[in-house]
């Protein structure tokens, strides 16, 4: 099986509570390598572009506001089946439905403030990675 890359965001609810290390520990324990990482303040334009697929949804404005409410940590993760593996490690979007030991079960505050984003496909991962990283910033 080929090595894949996926994109991750540690969301403002987690960074506000200084949980970056806790999230990274779950990621690395699951066998995903962090090959790029930076802490940023996402701009409104970045958030609107990133979540454009949800622009017609009623929660879009709140999502953009939340994602720009504090620092986020954007990451590139690498492993065999990285996309599926990270989605499993994150857990269900609603932390109440997330499996034990997942990021969202352990750390999320709510369905909105669920601590982590992960790409849903290899194709979307490539697009999402390119929005935040240049090639020389990925050092896997």
From Swiss-Prot:
Residues involved in ATP binding: 11, 59, 87, 93, 104, 114
InterPro entries: NDK-like_dom, NDK-like_dom_sf, Nucleoside_diP_kinase, Nucleoside_diP_kinase_AS
Catalytic activity as recorded in UniProt: a 2'-deoxyribonucleoside 5'-diphosphate + ATP = a 2'-deoxyribonucleoside 5'-triphosphate + ADP; a ribonucleoside 5'-diphosphate + ATP = a ribonucleoside 5'-triphosphate + ADP
GO terms classed as biological process: CTP biosynthetic process; GTP biosynthetic process; UTP biosynthetic process
UniProtKB keywords: ATP-binding, Cytoplasm, Kinase, Magnesium, Metal-binding, Nucleotide metabolism, Nucleotide-binding, Phosphoprotein, Transferase
Main location: cytoplasm
Highest taxon in the source lineage: Bacteria
GO cellular component terms given for this protein: cytoplasm
The gene coding this protein: ndk
Subunit relationships: Homotetramer.
Family membership: Belongs to the NDK family.
Top enzyme class: transferase
Name of the protein in question: Nucleoside diphosphate kinase
Active site: 117
A family per Pfam: NDK
Species classification: Bacteria, Pseudomonadati, Pseudomonadota, Alphaproteobacteria, Hyphomicrobiales
Enzyme Commission number(s) from the entry: 2.7.4.6
Cellular location(s): Cytoplasm
Cited HAMAP family: NDP_kinase
Cofactor: Mg(2+)
PROSITE patterns: NDPK, NDPK_LIKE
Protein purpose: Major role in the synthesis of nucleoside triphosphates other than ATP. The ATP gamma phosphate is transferred to the NDP beta phosphate via a ping-pong mechanism, using a phosphorylated active-site intermediate.
Organism: Xanthobacter autotrophicus (strain ATCC BAA-1158 / Py2)
Gene Ontology molecular function terms on file: ATP binding; metal ion binding; nucleoside diphosphate kinase activity
């Amino acid at each position: 099986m080929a090595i894949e890359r996926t994109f991750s965001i540690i969301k403002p609810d987690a960074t506000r509570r200084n949980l970056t290390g806790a999230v990274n520990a779950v990621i690395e324990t699951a066998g995903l390598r962090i090959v790029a990482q930076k802490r940023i303040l996402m701009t409104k334009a970045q958030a609107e572009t990133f979540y454009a697929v949800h622009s017609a949804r009623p929660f879009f404005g709140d999502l953009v506001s939340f994602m720009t409410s504090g620092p986020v940590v954007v990451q590139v993760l690498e492993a065999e089946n990285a996309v599926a593996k990270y989605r499993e490690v994150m857990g269900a979007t609603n932390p109440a439905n997330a499996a034990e030991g997942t990021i969202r079960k352990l750390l999320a505050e709510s369905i909105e403030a669920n601590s982590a984003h992960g790409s849903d496909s290899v194709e979307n991962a490539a697009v999402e990675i390119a929005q935040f990283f240049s090639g020389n910033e990925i050092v896997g």
